[in-house]
Every structure is written in C-alpha cells, then in structure tokens.
Amino acid sequence: MNTVSLNLDSTTKKEVIFMFIGREEELKILSSLLEKPSASAMIYGKRKVGKTTLIKKALENSKDKMVYYECLKAPLQENIDGFVAVLVREKIIPVQLAFKSFNDVFAYLNTLDSTFNIVIDEYPYLKTFTTPETVDSIFQSIIDNHITNVRLFVSGSHIGMMKDLLEEKNALYGRFTVFICLKELDYLTCSEFYRSKSVYDKIAMYAVFGGSPYINCALDERLSLKENIINTILNPSSYVYGYTEHLLISDYTNALNAERIFFAISNGHQKYKEIEEKLGLKTTGNLSKQIDALENMDIISRVYPINKPNDKKKLSFEVKDNLLRFYYAFIYKNKSALQMLGAEAFYEEYIEDSIVTFISHRFEEIARTYFSLCVKKRKLRGVSNIGTFYYDDSANKKNGEFDVVLERKNAYDIYEVKYYSVPMRLKEMQEEERQVRAIKGLQVGTIGFIAASGYEEMPGEYTCILADELYNL
C-alpha cells in the first residue's frame, strides 16, 4: 500500500490520502517497458479508474525523466505549445521554442542524449478541433520515426475513441507495444481500503461505493456505512457527489438521456422494452444507439443468462458502477428533498429501509466474482461459465432467474446468496432446494449457499460457503 498523492477534501476539511492498491499485473506489464530504450503503450478506461496513477506508479522508480502532459480540448497548436511548456518546465528544452507540429517536438527530443518517459493523457482531446484521422496519422509518424529514445504512454478516458486506435483501419493499428484496458478494482482488492471492517460491512461498502480507487480513497474505515454515505454521496460539496452527478458522463454528448437510462435501469427497468417505454423512445429507435454509446464508456453492460446466451428476450441491462447505481436508485429524483432535509434526515427517509435490498443484489455480483477468482487462481476446476440462469417452472406457472450459477460439463451448480445480519436457517435452505428440484429437465450438480452472517447448521448435502472465504483467496 503506497501513498501516491494528497488532496484536501473541502467537504470534511481533512486530508484525504490517495493510496495505491492492487494493479500488480498492469504494473508488471508497464514496468517491463522500462527495460527497453523505446516503447509505446496505450492505457484506456473510464474516468477515475486510476489510469494516470497507474502510469505514474510504474514510472516512479525509473532513472529516466518523466514528462506528463494532459491534453486540452483546444486546437492542436495550443496543445503543442502546452506540451512544449511542460518540456521547458522540466528543463528538457531551454526556452519556449515555436514548434509547429508534434512531429517537430519529438524529432527535437530524438537529438538529445537522454531517454524520456512521455505521457500523453486524455489523447482524444487532441481531436476536438482536428480530424481524428489527422491526429492518429501524426502519432503514427511519431512512433514510426521519432521515439528511439522515448517510451510513449498514450492514455484516454473516451473508451470508444481509444478502442478505435486498435482497429485495423486506424493509422495507429499495431503501433503500440502493449495496450491495457483498465477496469474497476474488484471487491477483494477494494477491501484493502477498509481492512478493519467486518466481512458483513466490507460487502456493504463495496455494494455502495464500488471499485473506483478515486472513490474508495474518500472513505473512512473508522466510520459506519451510513456515516460514509452521509459524508460523501449525500454531500453535494464532496467530490464523490460530483463524480456521480456529472464527471463520469462528461464526455457523453446527450447527458440528459444518459441520466434517464441510468435511472430506469437502477430502478428495476432492465429489459430493453421496459427502458424504451420508460423513456418514451419506443417510436424513435434511438435507444439502441444510446445504449451502445454508454456500453462503450464501460458504464452499462448487457447481461444474458448463461443458458440463454443469445436470447434477446432474456437480455437485461445493468449499471456496472455501484456508486452510480446507488445515486440513481436513491438520490437522482430526490435531490430537492436532500437539499431541504439535509443528509442525515434524507438517509433515514429515503435510504434506510431499502439499503439492505440494494446491497443484497450487489452481493450476488460479489459472489459471481468470487467464483471467477477461484477459477482464475485454479482453486476451482471444471467450470465452463459463471452467471445467472433462466428457468421456466411450468408446473408452478412461474419463471425467473437463479442469480449465481456455475456451468459444468453435464450439470449446473446453483448457489443462493443471502445478505442477512443473522445466520441462515436450515429450513430456508431446504425450501430453496425444493424450488430448484421442481424445475423439470434441470441437471443439478451442487446446491450451495453463501450467507453473509453464516448458518445455524451446515448440513453435508449442501455446500455452505462462509462469507470470510470470499476474502481469503
């Protein structure tokens, strides 16, 4: 755990220490480039997922000088001048010389005896006033001709535009030594931000605040879940509130429709038709394009049951970011009440009675991630897929989904996940088993449970996983 920067949270008037946690694989990849005199890397991911911090961490022990430039939403010449100003400040260029292109700047750097680590952050901003093809061609030429003593790190938050750089038709195709799509931290890694908490509380903290390092650094593990919510997401002066209200979708051109889509999905309207009807877009046909754009931003995702992988009728959408989901479930439509009541009263009126249900749904995702980690670490074998499972119980005239299912060669392992504050009872396990056995044609392997507060009994016919096991991989 390493301190990498320091901020002052104006909300709580206390210092917030930004810690570096996780990212071992990504660090290993980027650090390997430091063994070469010349390299190029592309790092992309949604806002505040830790791209810049990762790059700076990878470069902090390099003997070569680092140059960091964050691009502006401005004409190309302004960005060239800004980049040169950074080089002057770092004493790489003696004075502010009048370069007319990025090519000329990098050609000049090639004449120097030193090796440089150069970070071009928010690369898509260079395309604000210049055609994307032109910008990409410029950097293709730079990588091909002018980085013999440069390790170039190109980073960006506009995921769709960054992905385009990897397409065969793009000028930069095949130019990067490595590329990394940086995702949110998983529940296990995030638990390092609040190590002293009980497992029951760790589940709740991740369910609400999610996997952004930027957000997790704002949390105080000495405080309760309620207190952390009040101090951050219910405080309009907090940068956490700003993250949910506008920062995450600041690059999206139709923010209002994005908000309406998030609100619909976060409040149970997860099927395409349901979202379409909720937004009144049924006759326009625009929803599909808007969902595609938000998918490209890594904010929402499509979810198919593992036994219905291409069935559009069974397709549902979910908001991937836990904190964003929380904001649109509880706060978005009630902002005026938050202003009138204050954070504590708002929590008691609008959140307190429903928060356990909210956490329970996210606990299911934690459980699926747990099994995924077990497979990746080779602690669990013979699993071909992990997800939800759609069932049609014709005998009882009902259908639904099992939320945590492992697909094996000839059967499915089915797990029920319970976020209870008390131990799970045997009677409830038996009732869950009856429901599973009632489904005709379902080949069942294991029936199991994951209970946040343990079990009254752990009979041998069931696989009973203790919540502690999720955090001891």
Regions found by a protein language model. Name each.
Residues 1-345:
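Phosphate-binding site recognition
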